[in-house]
Amino acid sequence: MTADAVLPNPAAGVADEVAAYPPAVDLRTMMAKRPLPAVAPGTVDASSLTGEEPARLARRVLDKLNASLAAGDAAGVEECFNASQAYWKDSVALTWHLRTFGTPSTIAASLLETSRLRGLSREGFQVDGDAHFDPMFSFIDCHISFATSSPATKAIGKVLLLPVRGGDGNQVEWKIWILSTRVKSLDVHPENEALLRQPGRAISGEQDFETQTLIVGGGNAAVVLAARLKALGVESVMVERYSQAGDNWARRYGSLQFHVPTSSTQTPFLPYDDSLLGRMLKREDLANHMRRYVAEFHLNILTSSRVQSSVFDTSTKKWTITIKTPAGRVTATARHVVQATGLGSQQPFVPKLADEGLYKGVAIHSTEYQNPEVSLKAKGVRSVLVVGSANTAFDVLQDVHDAGLEVTMVARSATFVFPVEYLDNPLALGAYNTAGAGADEVDRNILSLPTLVEAWLTKGLFASLARAEPEKDR
């Protein structure tokens, strides 16, 4: 097969070059080892699990868990969890990190240590609102809330409880299958959205400055973090290499778009315009929203600038950062430095091929691709080989095809392709479109599941949606 142009996908092969820590794992291998737990038919009477009964049962389990934690009883904590499969997923609430623990013994040891370090309140984990029984999976789904004292926080989460028959085969006990915990707010620094409207600082790039937090980058993560910090009363300054916020999108290829529903990508404090909710976000939508975000909230940003070096002083507990700006070099001092420079997908990876010099056609990386006219047709290209099968590869494939060029995709391994409408299903990311469902509430439900469990549920959902459309080509 020959082609006039070859466009490698930016993500293709990166994993082969950079060692991951923790080591990368194959989700399919994990799924094969850990199927979802099965509840035998007739284990519980669904008709009895209505009204206040699910909440009462959940409260009984939580009371036992709280008592065991207070007593430092590892065996008692372990006994609260489902022996065959259990998870605890924490999002900053108790571990100050994003962690998922497996096996009851590991969960028990980790809960005992972190609840002590964070000062879990005397009340412990409490039922928060209603609980309900899911007849399809036979679990009780219950929201929870709790508080800590070190630091003083309010936190939320949920528990999923499974029915387990006791040793005599008759008695049914409810055990925790999944415990999810997530910090909601800091008591000492509650968010104040009114602070977002206060003027920012005049950062010229000519004078040294001091700030509480220096953020390296000016993309989505950077500007959202800057806004969050400002609402908490914490000053920050972003250092962005391009001439304005949003250029990390605006400078990429013209056909770029998100591959998930817009409603599931909302930004805090300033949502996307309603006119964008019915379609996928495109390059211009993303860039314009970032610029609007910075302007409306008067966020501090130093553009066309790059960090040259950084040194941490252990005595003052401060960073000294040297920054190259259009006006020269300035020095910034900050208590905290946050790197918000993305996942590295814009670092080109081009596989080394034997005798690659023999190929005389156009060979570019997708980071160099603009559009079919400028990047390909103007150079006489008529056929294109796209190497890779991630989102960028499909964007380019569609773009080149629509321009009337012959195009072929080469993928290293099988790629799971499904209709984008599946993602918009109310049981998937379409939950964000549900009338009356706030993003925080949907986040609380969707983000509570361990990745492995979410993978199993998504696989089952997509399989059922596919079975409902037998006329579609597979």
Residue ranges and their predicted role:
Residues 55, 59, 67, 71-136:
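A solvent-exposed, acidic/Ser-Thr-rich amphipathic alpha-helical stretch
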Residues 280-288, 394-474:
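Dinucleotide-binding/catalytic capping subdomain of oxidoreductase cores
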Residues 5-37, 145, 151-204:
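Short beta-strand edge/turn micro-motifs at domain boundaries
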Residues 178-218, 232, 267-276, 282, ...:
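Glycine-rich dinucleotide-binding loop and its adjacent helix/turn
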Residues 118, 122-169, 174, 279-345:
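Feature captures the FAD/FMN-dependent oxidoreductase FAD-binding
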Residues 243-269, 275, 416-436:
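Conserved N-terminal glycine-rich FAD pyrophosphate-binding loop of Rossmann-like flavoproteins
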Residues 2-75, 79, 202-205, 209-211:
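Short, low-complexity N-terminal intrinsically disordered segments enriched in polar/charged residues
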Residues 227-254, 405-418:
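Glycine-rich FAD pyrophosphate-binding loop
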